[in-house]
Amino acid sequence: MITVVTSTIRENMLERVIENFSRQSLEEKELIIILNKNDMKLGNLVAPNIRVFQLDEKKTLGECLNFGSMQARYETIAKFDDDDYYSPVYLENALRVLKDKGVDVVGKAGIFVYFKKDKLLTAFRPGMNSFFLKNKRVFLAGGTLVFKKEVLEKVPFQALNNGEDIQFQKDCLDQKLSLYSGSLHDYVLIRYPESHQHSWRVLDETFQKQCRWIAVTDTFEEYVRDGGGTL
């Protein structure tokens, strides 16, 4: 029914990748992991519905995502980031929105953000949900992209290491493909301490000023599930 594709250069995040995938309530699913660093080890990751590939670290993130998506057994692709949180019903709800709205790409323009060092849960652009993207002023969060495999035949990810998700959406709009932002719930972008290599390189203090503060908590799951009633 759906293929999750994750490309990573962080061996310490592999366990989180498996946890996010295994947590999903949807039964008919598979996970494709692309190891994009030459010294990363496969370990014991292989399972019937998990496949692992290793691409040379000279390959860009965009190229890795294209390769992984082309290995998919299912016709719908979900791009998972290796360091974020996806609730048990994330895939189920994304598929429902994709079908109900009849669009090519779904995701979330408004998202929860958890600052791990401060144990602070916030909402970034909380009002940016349930709308069609019509211009290039607002984009879906890269870790929330879910799309039909056939989209990549028209619009593959470009060979970029940063901004490949934004460029993908721009290219989709140029090709008159439809993009839709779903609800805020079921996904959390996690901000780790400074030593973590974030693709979005902005100081936590600056980022927090752009967010609505929700709670200081060790466990954010109850706040972010669909119907959690936090906003």
Residue ranges and their predicted role:
Residues 62, 112-113, 126-147:
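A recurrent flexible, glycine/aromatic-enriched loop bordering the glycosyltransferase active site
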Residues 19-28:
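Short, acidic, metal-binding catalytic loop of nucleotide-sugar glycosyltransferases
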Residues 81-86:
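The conserved acidic donor/metal-binding loop of glycosyltransferases
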Residues 113, 183-219:
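Active-site donor/metal-binding and catalytic loop motifs
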Residues 55-72:
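Glycine-rich, basic loop-to-helix element that forms the pyrophosphate-binding segment
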Residues 77:
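Short aromatic/hydrophobic "clamp" motif used to bind/position activated sugar donors
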Residues 89-120:
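Conserved donor NDP-sugar-binding/catalytic core segment of glycosyltransferases
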Residues 162-168:
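Acidic donor-binding loop at a coil-to-helix junction in glycosyltransferase catalytic cores
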